[in-house]
């Protein structure tokens, strides 16, 4: 079979497979390996308006080696700015400038969207000790930690338990109602149990009752709710007092210690400021049928953020540059989100401030957050809910199938990843916009089965440098970066040519729109995580 016929066969087989409920790998997948081999782009096609005339052109032109050059630029920016690119820092501003200038040079009109947010950075570890009835010192990151977005403070006070419900299987509502603080002695430290409502509500109720500080301990209703976790009082917290998180066992012990007095110190910086999203779109394409692609540009304060999420940002930037002269049928809009690490602030602001008619124009949103993890897996957001139960908005299952089809065409295995609201698709989900995307893993541990699928080491984190100083260029797996950059390019190209697979799924769901809307509202009300941290 000729290469030309190979290509024609691939496109035909792929179109059929994507529309099917169950996808099978093309029978001649091995023959396509040569076509997909990295390092063989056709320069005349890569610089041509015909780049997206088929979904196969853009992935062929998007080379990981060029993405790595952009990652090196982001690492250089971090190196010149205290080792990070966190939102509202000079390193982030330099990252914004780099993306903006690169897009402008490619011919894009670029919008830099400011938005308010509360910057939060730990300056050092906290301290916690008992002074009465006897001295005890507790260990940082073993017995207690900060809730993200806590205020700073240095408090010594009596500890007062608030409406606790101890024991396995408990349904704690501790601190969720103002009435829980009846007769609460002002100036005390409120000891509150996790459960039911969000941490912000608990802390603000305590502050309103006159608490000088708050300790929220884990719920203890199940074995996985006893230790420390990444938790937050939220970017909108206005209680004005320090809040720390502790283990369930410590919380129980403190609640049963008469006349307990604790000294807690929280050493953080928290201030209201503003930062930016960067948005650009192709000059051509139907403006009423937009395919939106997004990746967060900011890092955490602790490191340069080259995998998280320089990888998604740099791959998206390289793709945008390649698409600058292309002729898509549908307009492609790119966004580099700010303050994702502070709680998806930039993407949430963007979606919530779109007029209803503008939201309707976004047919699909594609999210790329961490696509170069060193011990990677090929993870696709579970749009159809077949792996984790929660479905995306109508059209999301079709997007998942497109990604699955790509991996099968490449002879690669893949699997679903949970819709857990840890990245910037969250507000698109809440707005009922079809979404999909890729992820190669963060702090979770690779299983034996996954090691057999993808290689790497079982029992080891997908990214041991997640949210750490060592998240630099050396932390990038270039094989993962190549595969996932190509997958991003493939699905973006496909949808830029036609959103029929998404349209058909939305139309099919139309008769069930009311029940689907109620399901979406219920799902949104049950969200326990928003970004990196648990919110309740």
From Swiss-Prot:
It comes from the Bacteria. One of its GO terms (biological process) is protein secretion by the type II secretion system. Zn(2+) 2 binds at residues 308, 341, 467. GO terms for molecular function: aminopeptidase activity; metal ion binding; metalloexopeptidase activity. Optimum pH is 8.5, active between pH 7 and 9.5. Coiled coil: none annotated. Processing of the 56 kDa pro-protein to mature protein requires elastase (lasB); in vitro it only occurs at greater than 55 degrees Celsius. The record marks 466 as: Transition state stabilizer. GO terms for cellular component: extracellular region. Zn(2+) 1 binds at residues 296, 308, 369. Mature protein inhibited by dithiothreitol and Zn(2+) chelators such as 1,10-phenanthroline, EDTA and EGTA. Not inhibited by serine-protease inhibitors, N-ethylmaleimide or phosphoramidon (which inhibits elastase). Residues 152-255 form the PA domain. Its EC number is 3.4.11.1. Its main location: secreted. It catalyses: Release of an N-terminal amino acid, Xaa-|-Yaa-, in which Xaa is preferably Leu, but may be other amino acids including Pro although not Arg or Lys, and Yaa may be Pro. Amino acid amides and methyl esters are also readily hydrolyzed, but rates on arylamides are exceedingly low. The active site is at 340 (proton acceptor). Residues 1-24 form the signal peptide. Keywords: Aminopeptidase, Disulfide bond, Hydrolase, Metal-binding, Protease, Secreted, Signal, Zinc, Zymogen. Disulfide bonds join 465-470. It is found in: Secreted. Belongs to the peptidase M28 family. M28A subfamily. A secreted aminopeptidase. Acts on free N-terminal amino groups with a very strong preference for Leu- followed by Met- and Ala-, and no activity on Glu- or Gly- peptides (an exhaustive analysis was not performed). Both the AP56 and AP28 forms have activity. This is Aminopeptidase. It comes from Pseudomonas aeruginosa (strain ATCC 15692 / DSM 22644 / CIP 104116 / JCM 14847 / LMG 12228 / 1C / PRS 101 / PAO1). The lineage of its organism: Bacteria, Pseudomonadati, Pseudomonadota, Gammaproteobacteria, Pseudomonadales. The gene is lap.
């Amino acid at each position: 079979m000729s290469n030309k016929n190979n290509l024609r066969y691939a496109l035909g087989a792929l179109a059929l497979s994507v529309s099917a409920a169950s996808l099978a790998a093309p029978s001649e997948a091995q023959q396509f390996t040569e076509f997909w081999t990295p390092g063989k782009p056709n320069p005349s096609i890569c610089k041509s308006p015909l780049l997206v005339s088929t979904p196969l052109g853009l992935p062929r032109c998007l080379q990981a080696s060029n993405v790595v050059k952009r990652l090196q630029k982001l690492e250089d920016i971090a190196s010149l700015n205290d080792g990070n690119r966190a939102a509202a820092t000079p390193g982030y501003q330099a990252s914004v400038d780099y993306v903006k200038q690169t897009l402008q040079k490619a011919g894009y009109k670029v919008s830099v969207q400011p938005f308010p947010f509360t910057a939060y950075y730990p300056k050092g570890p906290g301290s916690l000790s008992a002074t009465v009835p006897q001295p005890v010192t507790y260990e940082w990151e073993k017995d207690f930690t900060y809730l993200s977005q806590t205020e700073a403070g240095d408090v010594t006070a009596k500890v007062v338990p608030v409406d606790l419900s101890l024991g396995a299987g408990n349904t704690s509502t501790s601190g969720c109602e103002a009435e829980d603080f009846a007769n609460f002695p002002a100036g005390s430290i409120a000891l509150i149990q996790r459960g039911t409502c969000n941490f912000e509500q608990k802390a603000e109720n305590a502050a309103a009752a006159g608490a000088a500080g708050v300790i929220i301990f884990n719920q203890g209703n199940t074995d996985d709710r006893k230790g420390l976790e990444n938790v937050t009082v939220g970017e909108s917290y206005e209680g004005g007092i320090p809040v720390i998180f502790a283990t369930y066992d410590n919380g129980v012990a403190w609640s049963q210690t008469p006349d307990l007095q604790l000294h807690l110190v929280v050493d953080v910086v928290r201030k209201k400021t503003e930062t930016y999203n960067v948005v650009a779109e192709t000059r051509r394409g139907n403006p009423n049928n937009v395919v939106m692609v997004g990746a967060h540009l900011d890092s955490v304060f602790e490191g340069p953020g080259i995998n998280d999420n320089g990888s998604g940002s740099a791959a998206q930037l390289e793709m945008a540059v390649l698409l600058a002269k292309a002729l898509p049928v549908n307009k492609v809009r790119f966004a580099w989100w700010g303050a994702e690490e502070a709680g998806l602030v930039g993407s949430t602001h963007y979606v919530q401030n779109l007029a209803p008619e503008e939201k309707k124009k976004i047919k699909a949103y594609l999210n790329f957050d961490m696509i170069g993890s060193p011990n990677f897996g090929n993870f696709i957001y579970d749009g159809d809910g077949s792996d984790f139960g929660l479905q995306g908005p109508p059209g999301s299952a079709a997007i998942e199938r497109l990604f699955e089809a790509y991996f099968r065409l490449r002879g690669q295995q893949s699997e679903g990843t949970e819709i857990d609201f840890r990245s910037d698709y969250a507000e698109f989900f809440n707005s009922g916009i079809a979404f999909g995307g890729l992820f190669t893993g963060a702090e979770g541990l690779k299983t034996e089965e996954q090691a057999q699928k993808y290689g790497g080491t079982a029992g080891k984190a997908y990214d041991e440098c997640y949210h750490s100083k060592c998240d630099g260029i050396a932390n990038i797996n270039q094989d993962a970066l190549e595969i996932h950059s190509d997958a991003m390019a493939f699905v973006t190209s496909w949808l830029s040519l036609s959103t029929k697979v998404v349209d058909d799924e939305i139309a099919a769901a139309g008769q069930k729109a009311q029940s689907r809307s109620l399901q979406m509202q219920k799902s949104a009300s049950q969200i326990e995580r928003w970004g990196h941290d648990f919110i309740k």
